[in-house]
């Protein structure tokens, strides 16, 4: 499979989608709420994606919970990460949440949810209650449980947004945030611990500039991705860029320049979402390359949604998540 992830417009593939999915540079499709009507339609779409690609291809979605849950009707509601630490049995619930989220996606032939968020703190507009907590131990304890749940059902895990997006106020979807702190050791401690525990299969860096360390956003910085992530922390998994269509990546130039910089800096795979012209421009200008190691991220199990829903574990987890949402929703 190639390094580029892109999106498709609707419930079914167009002729253009089918043609693009055969391009050797394409390695993944990221789905959005607009791609989901009901359970059977989603299964049919994912089957069509795999057939059109004619080779292994990754299918992913942002389904972490709370406001970032693309598939809702017909799926269990997953709470924002912040809620787990507020509950008495929060660690147990976080593991159930990770398992439930991953299991329901696998039952619909989705390989990945880009989760969990390992950022610390609730102040950032882009993160807010997507974070598990405001201190290292709270984030570590609850994210570790969520990761255990995902792995138990056979979904690869993605830590984000390295080396920490939680301390900036600005939203990297809309602008490039600058983290002016002289040290981000506390934020880094979370990523370091999860890498050492061997529970992260992939990593997604932040479109954030940390000027005391490097002038480039982490997503396009060889300092962060090669020197720190690979060499210092010893991370061996896949590195995804965050969506290169986000304004946070604009300092790296146009679509081709952003893609080239991210790949040269150390990203293995790059995402270009909601801008088909930009994705095609990148396909036309990037040299063809393979990312065979990314096949390790394909889902590890196969089962139907009806089989899943018959499990007592599913019934219990789904009910518990709904109760948690009702308990803490404002």
Swiss-Prot record:
Pathway given for this chain reads: Cell wall biogenesis; peptidoglycan recycling
Top-level taxon of origin = Bacteria
Task: Extract one GO cellular component term from the record.
Answer: cytosol
For the site labelled Important for catalytic activity, the residues are 171
Q: Which PROSITE patterns match?
A: GLYCOSYL_HYDROL_F3
| Subcellular location(s) per record | Cytoplasm
Does the keyword Cell wall biogenesis/degradation belong to this entry?
yes
Q: Which GO terms describe its biological process?
A: carbohydrate metabolic process; cell division; cell wall organization; peptidoglycan biosynthetic process; peptidoglycan turnover; regulation of cell shape; response to antibiotic
Q: Which Pfam families match?
A: Glyco_hydro_3
> Which residues span the membrane?
none
Q: What class of enzyme is it?
A: hydrolase
Q: Which SUPFAM superfamilies match?
A: (Trans)glycosidases
| Residues annotated for substrate binding in this entry | 62, 70, 130, 160-161
The record's active-site residues are 173 (proton donor/acceptor), 242 (nucleophile)
Q: Which UniProt keywords apply?
A: Antibiotic resistance, Cell cycle, Cell division, Cell shape, Cell wall biogenesis/degradation, Cytoplasm, Glycosidase, Hydrolase, Peptidoglycan synthesis
| Endoplasmic reticulum is among the record's keywords | no
User: Which EC numbers does the record give?
Assistant: 3.2.1.52
Q: Its function?
A: Plays a role in peptidoglycan recycling by cleaving the terminal beta-1,4-linked N-acetylglucosamine (GlcNAc) from peptide-linked peptidoglycan fragments, giving rise to free GlcNAc, anhydro-N-acetylmuramic acid and anhydro-N-acetylmuramic acid-linked peptides. Plays a role in beta-lactam antibiotic resistance via its role in generating anhydro-N-acetylmuramic acid-linked peptides; these peptides function as signaling molecules that induce high-level expression of the beta-lactamase AmpC.
Protein family: Belongs to the glycosyl hydrolase 3 family. NagZ subfamily.
This one is known as: Beta-hexosaminidase
Q: Which organism is this protein's natural source? A: Vibrio cholerae serotype O1 (strain ATCC 39315 / El Tor Inaba N16961)
Its taxonomic path starts at: Bacteria, Pseudomonadati, Pseudomonadota, Gammaproteobacteria, Vibrionales
Which gene specifies this protein's sequence?
nagZ
């Amino acid at each position: 499979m190639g390094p580029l992830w892109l999106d498709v417009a609707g419930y079914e593939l167009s002729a253009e989608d089918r043609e693009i999915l055969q391009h050797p540079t394409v390695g993944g499709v990221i789905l959005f709420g607009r791609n989901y009507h009901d359970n059977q339609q989603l299964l049919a779409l994912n089957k069509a994606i795999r057939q059109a690609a004619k080779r292994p291809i990754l299918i992913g979605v942002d389904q972490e919970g709370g406001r970032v849950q693309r598939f809702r009707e017909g799926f269990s509601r997953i709470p924002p990460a912040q809620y787990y630490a507020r509950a008495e049995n929060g660690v147990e619930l976080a593991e159930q949440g990770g398992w439930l989220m991953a299991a329901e996606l696998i039952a619909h032939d989705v390989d990945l949810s880009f989760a969990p968020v390992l950022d610390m703190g609730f102040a950032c507009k882009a993160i807010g209650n997507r974070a598990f907590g405001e201190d290292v131990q709270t984030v570590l304890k609850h994210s570790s449980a969520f990761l255990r749940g995902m792995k138990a059902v056979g979904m690869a895990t993605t830590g984000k947004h390295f080396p920490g997006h939680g301390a900036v106020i600005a939203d990297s979807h809309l602008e490039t945030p600058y983290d002016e702190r002289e040290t981000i050791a506390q934020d880094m401690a979370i990523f370091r611990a999860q890498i050492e525990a061997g529970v992260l299969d992939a990593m997604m860096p932040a479109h954030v500039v940390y000027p005391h360390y490097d002038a480039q956003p982490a997503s396009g910085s060889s300092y962060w991705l090669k020197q720190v992530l690979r060499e210092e922390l010893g991370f061996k998994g896949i590195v995804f860029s965050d969506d290169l269509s986000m304004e946070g990546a604009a300092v790296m130039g146009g679509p081709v320049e952003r893609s080239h910089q991210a790949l040269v800096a150390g990203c293995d795979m790059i995402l270009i979402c909601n801008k088909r012209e930009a994705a095609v421009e990148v396909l036309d200008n990037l040299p063809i390359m393979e990312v065979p190691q990314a096949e390790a991220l394909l889902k590890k199990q196969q089962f139907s949604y009806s089989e899943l829903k018959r499990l007592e574990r599913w019934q219990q987890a789904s009910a518990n998540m709904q109760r948690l949402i009702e308990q803490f929703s404002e």
